[in-house]
């Protein structure tokens, strides 16, 4: 009995070591398919958990397995997994310094006029290790769902509204969700919406029509309609129409920039784009490798053709085409490991904005993949949240 118990124990430890190495490997290995992308997104964000698991696995290997080739293999796997899982934490101090410098370079001494009452509501540190384990409390807010703002082609489009606990007149955030223009709904990233509402914003999470039934510019038309509706009904929903910012993720970031940058755009005070595409012809010509989402197929579905067959439409659908002077201040938050929207295009956009005299801040997170903030308490979102709320306070103050 003791022999078989030992065999079972050793087998379980070997499996634990192998599983931990498999999970930890996605911190550095790009996901080749959409089915594996959640591992590439999540592994860096929960890496402190993986550090703990890998440390335990290493100890169990030493304690439970005799000196055999299997033990050395299991120990090597556990130690390699431990090394991989600790990489984001090792990068954290330098990353915090780089992000703080990027904020100062873009905004100057932005915290000088930050009211102490507002600062107390914000995160006090860019990164708190304990929050990875215990989570981040979004705080209290009022929630109203299903506010219909438009019915294009008879399709009702609605928004969800998050407001601070007390009635008032607040700066407004328009939240546009991700989903490659083909999926998603306003309930995505609800923790972020609740968090910002609890800290003094009226937050409108809006819907838009999807491909393949509706192609560009239908999605942009829907964002315009939402923006016009919010301007018209601002008092009813406790929003200050003079202090509106648009926050978008991925496809939503793309739409946010277009809605803010177009020459005839309704006025907004700031734009925040989390990993949003900016150059559609460039992205089509130079897709990432590997390309888990099949970039060209997504763009062809969204646009209704290729850049060769409809170059003007691709140009009009690219935020980089609208760069000129006097655009709203823009914050880009992007992962260096983003394998859907490549960082190099965002860097080009950032430099173009600066060259034309605009305010632009680019926060690059070295270990982060696309959609990193899907893990709300993860390493990357803690950094993003800390700086995003300060950028928005600066822009909407």
Model-derived regions, located:
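Primarily recognizes the serine-hydrolase "nucleophile elbow" in alpha/beta-hydrolase
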Residues: 26-30, 225-288
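Hydrolase active-site cap/lid region
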Residues: 106, 110-125, 257-312
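Conserved alpha/beta-hydrolase "acid-adjacent" motif
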Residues: 339-348
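Catalytic active-site module of serine/aspartate enzymes centered on a nucleophile-bearing elbow/loop
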Residues: 379-397
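Short beta-strand element of the alpha/beta-hydrolase
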Residues: 169-179
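Catalytic nucleophile-loop/oxyanion-hole region of alpha/beta-hydrolase
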Residues: 45-46, 184-193, 204-243, 262, ...
């Amino acid at each position: 009995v003791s022999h078989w118990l030992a065999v079972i124990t050793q087998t379980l430890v070997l499996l634990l070591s192998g599983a931990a190495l498999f999970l930890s490997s996605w911190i550095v290995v790009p996901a080749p398919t959409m089915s594996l992308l959640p591992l590439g997104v999540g592994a860096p964000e929960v890496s402190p958990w993986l550090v703990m698991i890998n440390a335990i696995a290493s100890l169990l290997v030493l304690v439970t397995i005799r000196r055999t080739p299997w033990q050395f293999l299991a120990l090597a796997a556990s130690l390699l997994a431990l090394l991989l899982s600790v990489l984001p934490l090792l990068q954290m101090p330098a990353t915090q310094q780089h992000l703080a410098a990027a904020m100062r370079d873009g905004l100057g001494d932005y915290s000088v006029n930050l009211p102490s009452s507002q600062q107390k509501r914000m995160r006090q540190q860019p990164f708190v290790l304990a929050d990875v384990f215990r989570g981040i409390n979004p705080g209290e807010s009022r929630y109203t769902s299903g506010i219909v703002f438009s019915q294009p082609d008879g399709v009702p489009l609605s928004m969800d509204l998050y407001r601070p606990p007390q009635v008032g007149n607040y700066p407004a955030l328009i939240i546009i969700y991700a989903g490659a223009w083909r999926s998603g709904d306003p309930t995505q990233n609800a923790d972020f919406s609740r968090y910002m509402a609890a800290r003094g914003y009226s937050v409108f999470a809006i819907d838009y029509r999807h491909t393949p039934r509706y192609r560009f510019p239908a999605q942009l038309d829907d964002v315009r309609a939402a923006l016009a509706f919010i301007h018209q009904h601002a008092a009813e929903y406790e929003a200050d129409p003079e202090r509106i910012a648009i926050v978008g993720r991925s496809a939503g970031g793309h739409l946010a920039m277009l809605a803010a940058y177009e020459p005839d755009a309704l006025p907004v005070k700031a734009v925040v784009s989390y990993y949003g595409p900016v150059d559609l012809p460039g992205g089509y010509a130079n897709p990432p490798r590997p390309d888990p989402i099949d970039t060209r197929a997504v763009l062809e579905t969204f646009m209704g053709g290729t850049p060769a067959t409809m170059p003007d439409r691709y140009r009009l659908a690219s935020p980089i085409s609208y760069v000129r002077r006097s655009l709203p201040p823009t914050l880009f938050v992007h992962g260096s490991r983003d394998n859907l929207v490549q960082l190099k295009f965002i860097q080009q956009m950032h430099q173009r904005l600066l060259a034309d005299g605009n305010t632009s801040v680019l926060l690059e997170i070295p270990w982060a993949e696309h959609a990193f903030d899907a893990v709300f308490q993860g390493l990357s979102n803690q950094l993003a949240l800390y700086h995003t709320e300060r950028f928005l306070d600066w822009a909407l103050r």
